């Protein structure tokens, strides 16, 4: 086959190829955009579950979420650095936030520089001061954040 014997140009076939390429690029852009928007969904969900337990005043479940260990009561010695009693003083009705009636995740972001977790900002009881909780990416434990970020 020589150049002069080339197949005839088929505009329908070329149109289908172009449309397929446009569709693939559009889907890829949408997937990348959604992945970026929901990049902290898991961490936000963990914190939302934690605050749901606090709203129900189920402090043992909240502590299990904080430590990411549902069987924490079987081996409380492993958590001597932040025992349940200290947790209850911080997050119970007598703690900084008082009785938690409402909690709404306001945003999430990593701290500046290299970080191993995500800071989740929560509006508690519609106060102007926000609670901020650190979620460690590797094991999903919660703690107090190493930095403070301002969310709008």
Regions found by a protein language model. Give the residues of each.
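N-terminal Lys/Arg-rich, disordered targeting/topogenic segments
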Residues: 1-17
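A broad, low-specificity signal for short, low-complexity segments enriched in glycine/proline
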Residues: 9-14, 22-24, 77-82, 91-97, ...
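Ser/Thr/Pro/Gly-rich low-complexity linker/stalk segments immediately outside membranes or between
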Residues: 11-12, 38-56, 60
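Hydrophobic membrane-insertion alpha-helices, especially the h-region
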Residues: 20-39
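Short extracytoplasmic
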Residues: 52-89
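Exposed beta-sheet edge and beta->alpha loop/turn motif
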Residues: 90-152
């Amino acid at each position: 086959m020589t150049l002069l014997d080339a197949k005839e140009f088929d505009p329908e076939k070329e149109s289908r190829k172009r449309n397929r390429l446009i569709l693939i690029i559009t889907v890829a852009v949408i997937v990348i955009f959604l992945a970026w928007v929901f990049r902290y969904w898991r961490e936000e969900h963990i914190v939302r579950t934690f605050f749901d337990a606090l709203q129900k005043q189920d402090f043992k479940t909240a502590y299990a979420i904080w430590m990411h260990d549902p069987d924490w009561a079987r081996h409380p010695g492993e958590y001597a650095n932040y025992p349940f009693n200290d947790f209850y003083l911080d997050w119970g009705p007598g703690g900084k936030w008082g009785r938690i009636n409402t909690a709404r995740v306001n945003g999430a972001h990593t701290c500046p520089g290299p970080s191993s977790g995500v800071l989740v900002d929560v509006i508690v009881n519609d106060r102007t001061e926000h609670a901020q909780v650190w979620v460690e990416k590797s094991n999903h434990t919660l703690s107090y954040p190493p930095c403070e970020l301002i969310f709008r």
